[in-house]
Amino acid sequence: MTQRTLRGTNRRRIRVSGFRARMRTATGRQVLRRRRAKGRYRLAVS
């Protein structure tokens, strides 16, 4: 039987790519700026 090798955790997901994590760094803010300019419905995972 095959095993699931990738098990994501929501806490890490939020910590790494959540809105507040993006706002914390200059490059993260650039990411948000690009996504706003593109017109994304969701700017970040959160």
UniProtKB/Swiss-Prot annotation:
Keywords: Ribonucleoprotein, Ribosomal protein. InterPro entries: Ribosomal_bL34. One of its GO terms (biological process) is translation. One of its GO terms (molecular function) is structural constituent of ribosome. GO terms for cellular component: ribonucleoprotein complex; ribosome. Belongs to the bacterial ribosomal protein bL34 family. This is Large ribosomal subunit protein bL34. It comes from Synechococcus sp. (strain JA-2-3B'a(2-13)).
